[in-house]
Amino acid sequence: MKYSVEHRRIWFKGEILDINDAKINIMAPTSQFGLNVFEGIPCYWNEEEKQLYAFRLDDHYERLMRSIKLIQIDCPYSKEDMKKAFIDVVRANEYDENLSVRQTVFVDGFGSWGSEGPADMFIAPVPKGRMSKEYNKKGLNCCITSWRRISDQNLSPRIKCGANYINSRAGQREALRNGYDTCIFLNEFGKVAEGPGSCFFMVKDGKLVTPLLTDAVLESITRDTIIKLAKSMNIEVVERTIDRTELYTCDEAFLCGSAMEITPVLSVDKYVIGNGENGSLTEKLHKEYLDAARGLIKEFKNWVTPIY
């Protein structure tokens, strides 16, 4: 049977249960110190095939296992365990719509910030409450935040953990207070890094340009997807260091991530990007992204995992 959002089924500590019945100890290290790592895994409904596809599921687990290793959590689950639990809980909800599925490995018990365990996991599917195409057409007015992106010298941005998002929150709150939609971070060297939960791309002279992975950015699966899609479309992709002022004079720009997909940047620090609208290349890439996520591109069919 299908469940309401308020009573959807989640996978929690080895069981599938009502989300309201999942309880975590308030003194657990995950509650007190943010000791957790996670993935936001998108699923897309293919209406023609009546099939729900998880997008790049194995790649998300590869990254999750890297985060677990770097944070040093003693996780009792293998990638195969995680994948089975993921499919089981999404099936249990009988979803026939687009989803974002939060899969989190956390440190439970009564330990401190130095504890490796006991560790456990929850998987919570969340229906996407908006039509991606309409949302992504609106675009974003951004600022360069005064906060610098965390670097590999303190807490690496390549780790997808709850604690890292405090840095993201600082930049996002500053942007909202000053009337912007979101922000773009510079790294410790004053070069362009990424958004608070998204990677940055710009279009300059017909080329798609994005910061290097060593410029303090997440090893983003969406970033990798866009690079591969662009190359398949014969678009030249350049990974390099980007100066702040290049943002103000680029032809197009967008932020991307599993949740926001590909969302155009209309302005940065009130400098209008291009003509202030969704750029043609950005729009083409977003369409290609959605087609790939729904299993419609033969070349990238291996990126999708059927749920039913």
Regions found by a protein language model. Name each.
Residues 1-77, 81-88, 112-308:
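Helix-start/capping segments and mature chain N-termini
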Residues 91-99, 235:
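Short secondary-structure junctions
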Residues 99-101, 140:
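Residue-level recognition of the N-termini of beta-strands and the immediately preceding loop/turn
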Residues 104-108:
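Short loop/turn motifs enriched for small/polar and acidic residues
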